Amino acid sequence: LKGMYGDCDYIDISYLLNEGKIFQYYHQGKIFLKKWFNSDKKNVVVCYTKVEFWDYPIIRYAYSLGYKIVYDQVETDYNTKGTNNSIKTKIHFLLTGKVSRRAYKWSDGSFVISEALKEQNLKAYPPQKMCILPNSTPILEKTKKQFFSNPPTILYSGTFAKKDGVEYLLKAFLLVQKKGYSCRLIMTGKGQPSDMKVLELVKDNPDVQYKGMVSDRELVETLLDCDILTMTRENSKFSNYGFPFKLSESLATGNPVIATNVSDVGKYVKHMESVYLVQPECVEEIANGIIYYLENPQNALQIGQNGLNVMKKHFSIEGVGKKFIDFLVNI
């Protein structure tokens, strides 16, 4: 797979790894790194959070040619509580973690997705340059919503690992119904078979619809059609060192959002202004957020519009892209 994306020349040689041709993978990687190197310009290799041991030699080769090496870190330890990985995956992440930490020591800088991740890196690698770079998203809103559906629809979209706090949302939804409010819950996404057992909490509830995995097009349509969007998380190291990509995606719809206050979420959005902010693992607060939106639909819609403005300010493709380029130019 190769071609041009905008002004970017790209090639994908990962198929060589999938075919077990690791030496050919190294050979091809070195050829293109040498071909693309321009001694009259700044040359940068941007690497993903985890450094796989088979990629380490190629990154070292790029460094020896004169490339600046920068990492894009979006998480901390992938084996932290709540990730529910298999033994095989845990061993793999343990090994890549060791390789990654070794690689970070001689890198030129890193993009990090949260303040906590920045502080963690600065303690471990003091000379390294850091840039907090949130994820970006396109604007999804097409027309400004004027009113809620009847009955209003709540959406959860994402994975179903313990870290995602789906259990608290389901219990909150049941509590809202118990208090006499009429609403529906739609869920999309997927998790490990053991994670999906959480749906047993609502297996006999006619107002809950689990759609499973959906296409990108259907996901956007569902995000726009639903009235209240939710982003839940547990209070875990994984949650507080990473950043929930679903937040910006939800804000981009212009619909009201209930968001768990983990990581840097509270630095971007304000409670009752651009989202309804709840503490992690708190059923009562999630229920109160749903009830507030149900009882105050016009206020909810305004909060959704304010959230869209936050997305445009902090998570737009243009804004995040400029921050990305500026850091690389000045590294």
Question: What are the language-model segments listed below?
Answer:
Residues 30-34, 53-56, 60-65, 71, ...:
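Membrane-proximal helix-turn-helix segments that form the acceptor-binding/catalytic region
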Residues 111, 146-174, 186-188:
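Conserved donor-binding/catalytic core segment of Leloir-type glycosyltransferases
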Residues 116, 136:
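Carbohydrate-associated surface elements
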Residues 151, 196-221:
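Nucleotide-activated donor-binding/catalytic signature segment of Leloir-type glycosyltransferases, i.e.
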Residues 157, 184-197, 212:
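Glycosyltransferase donor-sugar binding loop
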Residues 164, 217-222, 227-248, 259-267:
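Nucleotide-sugar-dependent
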Residues 271-272, 276-283, 292-298:
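Conserved acidic donor-binding segment of nucleotide-sugar-dependent glycosyltransferases
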Residues 285, 292, 299-314, 323-326:
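A short, well-ordered alpha-helix in the C-terminal region of glycosyltransferases
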